[in-house]
């Protein structure tokens, strides 16, 4: 047949048809691969959308947290401002209390009277007591000039004065013998001492009630606390005193009745601890000392000057100038 191949080329037609058909008809395996890729793409897009939504949610939470943080900062600033105002008020109150305390130290126990006026009145009362207490001894001493009192005493008690006069009459005979010149001063002394004893007897016999009253008043005056602002040491509220002669505060030891002894210095050396005595076991050199009365006076003076007694008192410049005991045991 002709070249069109209706019969002769009958075998080639199926091949041409087959070749043309394979261009448009995909194999089954390729179709499955393409579907798998599209499914993967869809899954990736879904994951991306989920990630974007999570990011947006996280950003929203972050913004809310930032807003809460700013609110907390605002509250913190307000609290700090209130605290600063409270601190200022506290400082003002402490300053007012300190001023009132210093003014109270200059007053007599807060009675509203100046210290000078009350101390003056106290001194006047003290002088009155002293004058009353010493009135009878002064009158006895000035009795040669008070003839009326001498006559009154001699008339009231003639029996007590009679032996004295008899003794006076006999003594000139002993002095006129002049046994030795060395005995003469002793006789003179006895002669001068005897009238004083007679005057004592007269005073005690004639003014017994006055002298007893004067002695009682004198004892009461001794027992009184003469210091208006005297401060006594209290272990419960005041710390023990210390000494800073070595450059650091070292607590002192108790000594005697209310006194204190240094633990780091003597009259010649200053070191802590004090050296051990070579000729006495378990004993160190004795430090400088301060008696209880001197320490009480020091506390009173420091309190009057406005010193804070809640802190340890430095005794570096207040020790006694006298020597110390040779040994003291510190264990």
From Swiss-Prot:
Region (Alanine-zipper): 51-86
Region annotation (Disordered) ranges: 104-140, 156-205
Flavoprotein found in the keyword field: no
GO MF terms, alphabetically ordered: DNA-binding transcription factor activity; sequence-specific DNA binding
Biased composition, class Polar residues, residue ranges: 104-122
BP-aspect Gene Ontology terms: response to ethylene
GO cellular component: nucleus
Keywords, alphabetical: Coiled coil, DNA-binding, Nucleus, Transcription, Transcription regulation
Coiled-coil positions: 43-101
Location of this chain's protein in the cell: Nucleus
SMART domains tied to this protein: GAGA_bind
Tagged with keyword Transcription: yes
Chief subcellular location: nucleus
Domain of life assignment: Eukaryota
Complexes and interactors: Homodimer. Heterodimer.
Protein family: Belongs to the BBR/BPC family.
Function: Transcriptional regulator that specifically binds to GA-rich elements (GAGA-repeats) present in regulatory sequences of genes involved in developmental processes.
Domain notes per entry: Alanine-zipper domain is involved in homo- or hetero-dimerization via electrostatic interaction.
Protein name as catalogued: Barley B recombinant-like protein D
Organism per entry: Oryza sativa subsp. japonica (Rice)
Lineage of source species: Eukaryota, Viridiplantae, Streptophyta, Embryophyta, Tracheophyta
């Amino acid at each position: 047949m002709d070249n069109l191949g209706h019969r002769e080329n009958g075998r080639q037609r199926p091949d041409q048809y087959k070749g043309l058909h394979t261009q448009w008809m995909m194999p089954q395996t390729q179709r499955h691969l393409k579907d798998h890729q599209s499914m993967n793409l869809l899954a990736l897009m879904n994951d991306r959308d989920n990630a974007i939504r999570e990011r947006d949610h996280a950003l929203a939470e972050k913004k809310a947290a930032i807003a809460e943080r700013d609110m907390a900062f605002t509250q913190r600033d307000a609290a700090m401002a209130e605290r600063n105002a409270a601190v200022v008020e506290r400082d003002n109150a402490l300053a007012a209390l300190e001023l009132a305390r210093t003014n109270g130290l200059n007053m007599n126990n807060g009675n509203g009277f100046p210290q000078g006026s009350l101390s003056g009145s106290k001194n006047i009362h003290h002088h009155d007591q002293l004058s009353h207490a010493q009135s009878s001894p002064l009158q006895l001493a000035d009795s040669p000039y008070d003839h009326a009192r001498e006559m009154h005493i001699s008339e009231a008690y003639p029996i007590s004065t009679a032996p004295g006069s008899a003794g006076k009459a006999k003594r000139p005979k002993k002095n006129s013998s002049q046994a030795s010149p060395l005995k003469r001063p002793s006789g003179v002394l006895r002669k001068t001492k005897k009238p004083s004893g007679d005057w004592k007897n007269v005073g005690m016999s004639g003014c017994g009630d006055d002298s007893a009253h004067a002695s009682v008043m004198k004892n009461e005056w001794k027992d009184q606390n003469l210091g208006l602002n005297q401060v006594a040491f209290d272990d419960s509220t005041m710390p023990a005193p210390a000494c800073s002669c070595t450059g650091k505060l070292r607590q002192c030891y108790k000594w005697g009745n209310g006194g204190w002894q240094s633990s780091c210095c003597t009259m010649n050396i200053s070191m802590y601890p004090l050296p051990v005595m070579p000729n006495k076991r378990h004993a160190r050199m004795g430090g400088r000392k301060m008696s209880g009365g001197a320490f009480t006076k020091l506390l009173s003076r420091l309190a009057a000057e406005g010193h804070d007694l809640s802190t340890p008192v430095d005794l570096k410049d207040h020790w006694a100038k006298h020597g110390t005991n040779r040994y003291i045991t510190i264990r």
